[in-house]
């Protein structure tokens, strides 16, 4: 038989015991204990780390390839005294022809700048890059105008390229239009300007520029279109050759379209206004 005193003592003991453990009650509640056991904090952190490592592992190869592609530049300093044996543009045209099931010849004769008509030198600079001798590789006003035009068009259509930029593309780059290729073009252009004189850049450009199907360089262009050497070109003939440079495989100076004739006339007026460039 349990006495009232014993029952009271039992209640008092239980009360004291509950008072002692009550601060721990929230952390020891079944719900809290169950949650802590099924979703430990360390597991969530481990999963986050694994995701981060996976993303880094996937991105690193891409970043490495872009770094190599952008920053491992061709050694343009060799062009001070050595002429290129072939250009990226020539190889691209050959590959395009082979993809269509035929081959094209390559009409190309290298000549020093001193053997190219001063009229042609003037005409090309006037038509392609009027500030060539004063800028450091880039015509920022032209680039700004091209950027606004491309923004309105919604795609890359116009480049605003200088002669040095065109040389970089002809020598080393593919014909695709992308921001990554423009970045590489920028770096190569800077390198060309740093290592070569303006006269050497112009000489290289005039000797590798495309002037028709399989026709490269001023000497080959003069023979192909006018049956003469580039040193003997008149101002009128030089203006025609400069006029077809933007689309040399489409235009022919002997087939004078209205648009080509207008471009020729503008170039010829610029030649007549400017003094003849001195012999290099």
Q: What spans do the regions from the language model cover?
A:
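Juxtamembrane regions of bacterial inner-membrane/periplasmic proteins
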Residues: 39-280
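N-terminal Lys/Arg-rich, disordered targeting/topogenic segments
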Residues: 17-50
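Residue-identity detector for glycine
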Residues: 8-15
């Amino acid at each position: 038989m349990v006495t009232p005193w014993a029952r009271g003592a039992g209640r008092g003991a239980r009360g004291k015991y509950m008072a002692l453990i009550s601060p721990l009650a929230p952390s020891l509640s079944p719900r809290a204990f169950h949650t802590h056991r099924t979703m430990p904090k360390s597991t969530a952190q481990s999963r986050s780390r694994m995701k981060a490592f996976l993303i880094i592992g996937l991105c690193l190869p891409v970043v490495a390839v872009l770094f190599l592609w952008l920053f491992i530049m061709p050694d343009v300093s060799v062009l001070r005294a050595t002429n290129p044996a072939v250009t990226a543009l020539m190889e691209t045209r050959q590959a395009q022809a082979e993809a269509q099931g035929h081959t094209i010849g390559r009409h190309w004769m290298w000549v020093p700048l001193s053997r190219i008509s001063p009229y042609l030198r003037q005409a090309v600079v006037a038509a392609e890059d009027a500030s060539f001798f004063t800028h450091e590789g880039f015509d920022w006003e032209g680039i700004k105008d091209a950027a606004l035009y491309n923004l309105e068009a919604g795609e890359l259509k116009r480049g605003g390229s200088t002669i040095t930029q065109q040389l970089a593309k002809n020598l080393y780059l593919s014909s695709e239009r992308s921001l990554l290729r423009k970045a590489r073009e920028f770096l190569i252009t800077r390198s060309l300007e740093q290592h070569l004189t303006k006269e050497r850049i112009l000489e290289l450009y005039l000797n590798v520029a495309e002037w028709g199907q399989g026709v490269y360089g001023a000497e080959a262009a003069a023979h192909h279109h006018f049956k003469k050497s580039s040193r003997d070109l008149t101002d009128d003939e030089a203006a025609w050759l400069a006029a077809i440079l933007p689309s040399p495989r489409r235009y022919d100076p002997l087939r004078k379209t209205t648009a080509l004739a207008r471009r020729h006339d503008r170039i010829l007026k610029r030649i007549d206004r400017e003094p003849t460039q001195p012999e290099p």
